[in-house]
C-alpha cells in the first residue's frame, strides 16, 4: 500500500522526515507553505534567481517569515498552538520593514543635522575671532590717540545677538568686507579716510584773528648800524612799543660803549646816549627803529597796533636817521 501511494502521488523518498531534529521541514509540511512536492529543483532555483525591488534585508519571503515566527514560538515560554495568526504576522512584518526604513531615515537626518551644526559652529567661531581682533585693534588705537576707533563691520560672519553692538552712529563709515580678513590697521585707514568730512568755510575775519594770535616764530633778528653783530628779540614778551625801545637799549648799549674810549667826557655823555635810545620811535634822534614786514617792505615802527606789528614783523633794524629819506621822516611827523 505504501508503495502504491508513493507512486500515485509521485513523491521522492522521504529521507529527511526520518531525522527528528529537522523541524523546519516538518513545519513546512504542517503549514503547507513549502513548495509543491511535484515541483522539481529547477523551480526552486528559478525562484531564488527572481529579481525583487527594495533594499537588501528589508523585504523577506513568506518562508523566512514563517520560520522566524516558528522560532519565536519555540523560544517563548508561553503556550502556543504551533503557529501565529495571520494578522500578527502581517503586523510584525510591517513593523520590521517600517522600523528599518525609519531607522535609515533617522540616521540620514542625524548626519545632515550634525553637518549643519558643525558648519554653524565654524562660522560662529570665525566671527568671534574677528570680533576679538577688532576689539584689540580698537583698544590699541584709543591708547595711541592717533585716530578714532573703527565702527564694527556689518559684513563679518554672523555673531550671537547678545555679542552684537546695539547702537551705531548715523555717520558710521561703510565697513570693509573681504576674505581673508583685512588687517586692523588697513581697516582703520579705510574707515578714517571715508569718515573725513569737508572743512566748513570760515570768515576772513576769523582767519585774520588766528594768524594774529598763533604766530609760530616770535623771535625776530635785529641789527644796528655800526655794530657788526646782530641779536634776536622775542616780541611776544613785550606788550607795547615802549617796552621794545627799552629792550633795544639793553641789547646794544654795551656794544656802543665798547667801541668808544672810556674817558670822563664819555661817561659824562652817558645821559645823551640814553636820550638817543629813547627817541628811537619818533625818528628825531640819532637812530631810528624800522622793521621789514611779511612782504619785504621796510616800515617805521609804531605805525600799526602792537598786535599787528608782532604778527607781521620779520626783521628789525636800528638805522641812522641821516640815512633815512626825508620823505619818510616827514610822513611820520604828519602822522
Curated annotation (Swiss-Prot):
Compartments reported by the entry: Nucleus
In terms of PROSITE patterns, this protein maps to: PB1 (PS51745)
The induction text for this entry reads: Not induced by auxin.
Intervals of motif EAR-like (transcriptional repression): 51-55
Q: Where is the PB1 domain?
A: 217-321
Q: Which domain of life is it from?
A: Eukaryota
| Alphabetic keyword roster | Auxin signaling pathway, Nucleus, Repressor, Transcription, Transcription regulation
Q: Using the UniProt annotation, give all residue ranges assigned to the region (Disordered).
A: 81-102, 143-180, 188-207
Looking up InterPro entries in the UniProt record yields: AUX/IAA_dom (IPR033389), AUX_IAA (IPR003311), PB1-like (IPR053793)
Does the keyword Transcription regulation feature in the UniProt annotation? yes
What GO terms in the biological process aspect are recorded for it?
auxin-activated signaling pathway; regulation of DNA-templated transcription; regulation of translation; response to auxin
Gene3D superfamilies under this entry? Answer: Phosphatidylinositol 3-kinase Catalytic Subunit, Chain A, domain 1
Tissue expression, as annotated, is:
Highly expressed in roots. Expressed in shoots and flowers.
Q: Name one Pfam family in it.
A: AUX_IAA
Q: Which residues cross the membrane?
A: none
Establish whether keyword Repressor is in the entry. Answer: yes
Quick one: a GO cellular component term? nucleus
What this chain does, per the entry, is described as: Aux/IAA proteins are short-lived transcriptional factors that function as repressors of early auxin response genes at low auxin concentrations.
What family is reported?
A: Belongs to the Aux/IAA family.
The record's note on quaternary structure and interaction partners says: Homodimers and heterodimers.
The protein depicted here goes by the name Auxin-responsive protein IAA6
Amino acid at each position: 500500500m505504501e508503495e502504491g501511494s508513493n507512486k500515485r502521488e509521485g513523491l521522492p523518498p522521504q529521507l529527511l522526515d526520518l531525522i527528528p531534529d529537522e523541524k523546519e521541514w516538518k513545519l513546512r509540511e504542517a503549514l503547507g507553505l513549502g513548495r509543491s512536492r511535484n515541483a522539481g529543483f529547477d523551480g526552486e532555483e528559478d525562484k531564488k534567481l527572481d529579481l525583487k525591488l527594495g533594499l537588501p534585508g528589508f523585504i523577506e519571503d513568506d518562508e523566512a517569515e514563517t520560520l522566524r515566527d516558528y522560532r519565536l514560538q519555540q523560544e517563548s515560554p508561553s503556550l502556543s498552538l504551533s503557529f501565529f495568526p495571520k494578522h500578527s504576522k502581517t503586523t510584525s512584518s510591517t513593523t520590521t520593514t517600517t522600523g528599518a526604513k525609519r531607522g535609515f531615515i533617522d540616521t540620514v537626518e542625524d548626519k545632515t543635522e550634525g553637518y549643519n551644526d558643525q558648519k554653524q559652529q565654524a562660522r560662529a567661531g570665525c566671527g568671534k575671532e574677528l570680533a576679538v581682533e577688532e576689539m584689540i585693534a580698537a583698544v590699541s588705537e584709543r591708547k595711541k590717540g592717533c585716530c578714532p576707533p573703527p565702527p564694527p563691520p556689518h559684513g563679518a560672519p554672523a555673531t550671537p545677538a547678545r555679542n552684537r553692538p546695539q547702537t551705531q552712529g548715523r555717520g558710521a563709515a561703510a565697513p570693509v568686507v573681504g576674505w581673508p580678513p583685512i588687517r586692523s590697521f588697513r581697516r582703520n585707514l579705510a574707515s578714517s579716510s571715508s569718515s573725513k568730512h569737508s572743512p566748513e568755510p570760515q570768515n576772513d575775519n576769523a582767519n585774520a584773528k588766528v594768524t594774529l594770535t598763533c604766530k609760530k616764530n616770535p623771535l625776530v633778528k635785529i641789527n644796528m648800524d655800526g655794530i657788526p653783530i646782530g641779536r634776536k628779540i622775542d616780541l611776544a614778551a613785550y606788550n607795547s612799543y615802549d617796552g621794545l625801545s627799552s629792550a633795544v637799549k639793553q641789547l646794544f648799549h654795551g656794544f656802543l660803549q665798547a667801541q668808544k674810549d672810556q674817558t670822563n667826557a664819555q661817561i659824562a655823555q652817558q645821559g645823551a646816549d640814553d636820550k638817543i635810545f629813547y627817541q628811537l620811535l619818533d625818528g628825531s634822534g640819532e637812530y631810528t627803529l624800522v622793521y621789514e614786514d611779511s612782504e619785504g617792505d621796510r616800515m617805521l615802527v609804531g605805525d600799526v597796533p602792537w598786535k599787528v606789528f608782532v604778527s607781521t614783523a620779520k626783521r628789525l633794524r636800528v638805522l641812522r636817521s641821516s640815512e633815512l629819506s626825508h620823505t619818510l621822516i616827514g610822513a611820520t611827523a604828519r602822522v
